[in-house]
């Protein structure tokens, strides 16, 4: 499908929250006043210089920004092609990019007078970031997490509990991220007066996809400045993994109107695109889920299918609506990596660079192993290393033991 190209790829969404045919706000009547209040509060925060000053202070002194742009010399030499840089989001406080967005949303929640924060989490990184900021600001925190993810991400469950959050295992459906999001939305509907729903990815009803993207765009903004300092020019290509896609949009968005920059998103191909996977663009079609229209994994009857990935953060059966639009306009190329490819990349990076990545960005690294050797040595490639792999070590160790 082709979409008429806009004057700018950075101008969306429109006033109703649409990116082309994608996005919007498909929510229960009970929630609509809340969504409109949030939109108004966020617009007010954006227009308030003191809000940005306060946020910048926390990003610097609490989160630890700017995160480094690191030249991966040994990986570059090993692949023999493009010069590879990592945007080191795994060095942020809490261990991933998630904290950038959570800080912004919690500051908006405080502005709205909300005292109770709910969140969904898959890999647990968003849950940890939310629990962390709630502890910092003295707010009640409830995190919904699929029971399957609770089992495979125990280190993060313990972290959330130590930070004072209540972790609610979700037993419905496939007991993963989609089901956790369903439960969070149900809670929100019944607790509208005092509760703020802190969504972890660039999905959900408007203004969430825009708001999450805006808070994450610091990744790409810093990368532009850092690459100019390191190489005197823009990168030639960007690569990031995609679940809902907030880490990718954070890196991509500031570069969307730079036509010389190639952009690649990497979905989770699971066991392969003809089997169990979570690649919504490669194997899905447009539909409505969790308040927005986007590409979804659906059966012939339009029922949502379960996503599968070795990575708990990528098995969502949809993708952020802006990604769907960027796919249809052709501005971003979407690829996919299997569980086995991600696992191999996880091990390779650990041994070559002394950096243990999360399984989520290991999917992006897996595609870099193919893309980089095809490009000349003066090609500058930036990968968003969106999280660290501490949370995945027990799971990976168990898989590797089983392979012996």
From Swiss-Prot:
**Pathway entry:** Amino-acid biosynthesis; L-tryptophan biosynthesis; L-tryptophan from chorismate: step 5/5
CDD domains registered for this protein in UniProt: Trp-synth_B
Q: Has the keyword Chaperone been applied to this entry?
A: no
Q: Does the keyword Amino-acid biosynthesis apply?
A: yes
| InterPro entries xrefs | Trp_synth_b_CS (IPR006653), Trp_synth_beta (IPR006654), Trp_synth_beta/beta-like (IPR023026), TrpB-like_PALP (IPR001926), TrpB-like_PALP_sf (IPR036052)
Q: Which Pfam families match?
A: PALP
- List the EC numbers from the record: 4.2.1.20
Annotated catalysed reactions = (1S,2R)-1-C-(indol-3-yl)glycerol 3-phosphate + L-serine = D-glyceraldehyde 3-phosphate + L-tryptophan + H2O
Any one GO MF annotation of this record: tryptophan synthase activity
Instruction: Describe the protein's quaternary organization and the partners it interacts with.
Output: Tetramer of two alpha and two beta chains.
User: Which HAMAP family does this UniProt record tie to the protein?
Assistant: Trp_synth_beta
Family, per entry? Belongs to the TrpB family.
Q: What does this protein do?
A: The beta subunit is responsible for the synthesis of L-tryptophan from indole and L-serine.
Report the PANTHER family cross-referenced here: TRYPTOPHAN SYNTHASE, TRYPTOPHAN SYNTHASE-RELATED
The name of this protein is: Tryptophan synthase beta chain
Q: Which gene encodes it?
A: trpB
């Amino acid at each position: 499908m082709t979409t008429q190209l806009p004057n700018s790829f950075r101008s969306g969404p429109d006033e109703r929250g649409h990116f082309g045919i994608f996005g919007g706000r498909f929510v229960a009547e009970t929630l609509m006043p809340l969504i409109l209040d949030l939109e108004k509060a966020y617009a007010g925060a954006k227009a308030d210089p003191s809000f940005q000053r306060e946020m910048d202070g926390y990003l610097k002194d609490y989160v630890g920004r700017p995160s480094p742009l690191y030249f991966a010399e040994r990986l570059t030499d090993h692949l023999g092609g493009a010069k590879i840089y990592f945007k080191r989001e795994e060095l942020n406080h809490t261990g991933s990019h998630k904290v950038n967005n959570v800080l912004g949303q919690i500051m908006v929640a405080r502005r709205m007078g909300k005292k109770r924060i709910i969140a969904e989490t898959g890999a647990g990184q968003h849950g940890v970031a939310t629990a962390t900021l709630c502890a910092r600001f003295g707010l009640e925190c409830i995190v919904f997490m699929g029971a399957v993810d609770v089992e495979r991400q125990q280190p993060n469950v313990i972290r959330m509990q130590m930070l004072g959050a209540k972790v609610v295992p979700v037993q419905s459906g496939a007991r993963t991220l989609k089901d956790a999001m369903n439960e969070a939305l149900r809670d929100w509907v019944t607790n509208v007066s005092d509760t703020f729903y802190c969504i972890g990815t660039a999905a959900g009803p408007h203004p969430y996809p825009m708001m999450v993207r805006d808070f994450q765009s610091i990744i790409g903004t810093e990368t532009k400045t850092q690459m100019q300092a390191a190489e005197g020019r823009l990168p030639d290509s960007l690569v990031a993994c995609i679940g809902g896609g907030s880490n990718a949009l954070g890196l991509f968005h500031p570069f969307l109107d730079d036509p010389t920059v190639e952009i690649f998103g990497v979905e989770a191909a699971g066991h392969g695109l003809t089997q169990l996977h979570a690649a919504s663009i490669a194997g899905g079609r447009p539909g409505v889920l969790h308040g927005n229209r986007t590409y979804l994994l659906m059966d012939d009857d339009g029922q949502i299918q379960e996503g599968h990935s070795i990575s708990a953060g990528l098995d969502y059966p949809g993708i952020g609506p802006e990604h769907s639009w960027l796919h249809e306009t052709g501005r971003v190329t979407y690829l996919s990596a299997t569980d086995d490819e991600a696992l191999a990349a996880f091990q390779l990076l650990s041994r070559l660079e002394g950096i243990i990545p999360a399984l989520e960005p290991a999917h992006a690294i897996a595609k870099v192993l193919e893309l980089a050797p095809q490009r000349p040595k003066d090609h500058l490639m930036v990968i968003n290393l969106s999280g660290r792999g501490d949370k995945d070590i027990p799971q990976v160790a168990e898989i590797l033991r089983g392979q012996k």
